[in-house]
């Protein structure tokens, strides 16, 4: 079985509580996960597209882990997507490298889950806010999976809450790697 590639796109990972803890938990399973921190790998912002594409091709599943920034992803991750998901590789008449590959978002959100609802402060769900990622997965014919989210990072979550989320996150990714049906 191929490993799962986790693309970590956090511009201030050293200040992150949740994303750092998730990375720690993932790194306990080097036989299952490759953790790839793009802000650390490319501090100058120049992406080695061929290297990134080869890394993706060498993995069965692709996880995008990032903090929600202004109801979107951090800017360098958007650049990474634009640069790496190229015509002829990710899409187009000969672009099929992501076809049927499982893709999932793992995000940390500053606001509470109640605010991400039809009746919440922003009147839309996190799935709705991040829908462009699902559309991207559909466009490249990947197998998009439900989002894994930790809400309320701005509300100083307890270390127990963060630890539980990290354990649950890794368990979910292990299940994802072992599943044969389309969604879990």
Regions found by a protein language model. Give the residues of each.
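Helix-loop-strand module that forms the ligand-binding subsite of alpha/beta enzymes
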Residues: 50-134
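Structural beta-sheet core signal
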Residues: 6, 35, 64, 103-107, ...
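Structural motif
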Residues: 42-50, 157-161
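A short helix->loop->beta-strand "cap" motif at the edges of active sites that frequently abuts
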Residues: 2, 98-102, 142
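Glycine-rich phosphate/pyrophosphate-binding loop and the adjoining helix
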Residues: 24-27, 133-184
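A short beta-strand-loop structural module common to alpha/beta enzyme folds
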Residues: 32-45
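N-terminal beta1-alpha1 ligand-phosphate binding loop
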Residues: 1-33, 168-170, 174-175
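Residue-level detector of anion-binding/catalytic polar loops
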Residues: 32, 62, 143
């Amino acid at each position: 079985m191929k490993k799962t590639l986790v693309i970590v796109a956090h511009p201030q990972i050293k200040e992150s509580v949740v994303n750092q803890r998730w990375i720690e938990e993932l790194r306990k399973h080097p036989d299952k996960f490759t953790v790839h921190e793009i802000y650390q790998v490319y501090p100058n912002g120049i992406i080695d597209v061929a290297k990134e594409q080869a890394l993706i091709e060498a993995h069965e599943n692709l996880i995008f882990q990032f903090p929600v920034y202004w109801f979107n992803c951090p800017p360098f991750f958007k650049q990474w997507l634009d640069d790496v998901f190229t015509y002829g590789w990710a899409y187009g008449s000969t672009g099929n490298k992501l076809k049927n590959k499982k893709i999932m978002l793992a995000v940390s959100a500053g606001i509470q889950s109640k605010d991400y609802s039809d009746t919440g402060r922003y009147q839309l769900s996190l799935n709705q806010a991040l829908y462009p990622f699902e559309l991207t997965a559909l466009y490249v014919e990947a197998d998009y999976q439900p989002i894994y989210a930790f809400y309320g990072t701005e509300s100083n979550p307890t270390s127990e809450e963060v630890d539980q989320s990290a354990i649950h996150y890794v368990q979910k990714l292990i299940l994802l790697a072992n599943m044969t049906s389309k969604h879990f």
